[in-house]
Amino acid sequence: MHRTEPTINCVHDGTRSLHLSIDTTRALPAHSGNEPTRTHLAAVRVSLLKTIPVAPPKILKDSSFRVTLRIDPSEEYCTMHRSKSLAFVALFAALISSSALVSIPLKPVPLVLQNAAAVLTGLLLGPRDGALAVLSFLGAGLLGLPVFSGGRGGYTALFAPTGGFLLGYILAATLAGAIAQHHRLSCTPPRGGGRALLLWIRLTVATLVGFLSIYSIGLPVLGYVLGLRTGELMLGVFLPFFLADTLKIALVVLLAHHLAPTVRRHLYRHG
């Protein structure tokens, strides 16, 4: 039994609907005398954007049929300008470094803005470029530049009690960028009340996870270096500092929401 691929004709009527006229004549058996075979359409690839699943149509007597697909406008296709991406990595690495100027010396760890800058970097640049920006910032500090809190620099900062928090910035940018679904955040502006609310929720969860991931590395290292127990870490470090971080979380969410269109306009091209 010889079968060939069906012919697919696409017609766009200017709305969100894409009409596919699919001729299955050539997909039928070569011999005659039988009713046309039922054709199962598993999926249709549209403009190389994504594979859109379609329910198998029931064809018993007709050799052609018409399918209407509703295109979701949130699935907008865009690609990244790689040269601009590297420029943004350098820009946000400088942002994280400059945020070291805002530091309140407290014990056992200072109150800083660098954790907020690291999470914001992940939200806007995504997990890969966000982590790359943090690594660039850490590399500058390891070379001796005074980019760590309090104007510190050098490899000894990583072996200090707060060294775990610096390493946690990498995880924070990665997780925040991944949870925020960076590609959709950067490529697709929110449309409609439901989607706008979903964007706020996604940004809030991503930011919260980013901050908590910094503590997940920083607290164990701090406890190991200073010999503090878990209870002492939770009551003396985590609770008071995380209460202050709630204000930074709100600030990061607001900044990410308002800066995402700028990133989308400069960093991505559509088509």
From Swiss-Prot:
Q: Does the keyword Nucleus apply?
A: no
InterPro entries hit by this protein: BioY
Q: Provide the membrane topology annotation.
A: Multi-pass membrane protein
- Please name the GO terms that the record assigns under molecular function: biotin transmembrane transporter activity
Q: Please give the start and end residues of each transmembrane region.
A: 86-106, 131-151, 159-179, 208-228, 235-255
| Disulfide bridges in this chain | none
As for subcellular location, the record says: Cell membrane
Q: Which UniProt keywords apply?
A: Cell membrane, Membrane, Transmembrane, Transmembrane helix, Transport
Q: Name one GO cellular component term.
A: plasma membrane
Q: What does this protein do?
A: Probable biotin transporter.
Q: Which family does it belong to?
A: Belongs to the BioY family.
- Quote the protein name from its UniProt record: Probable biotin transporter BioY
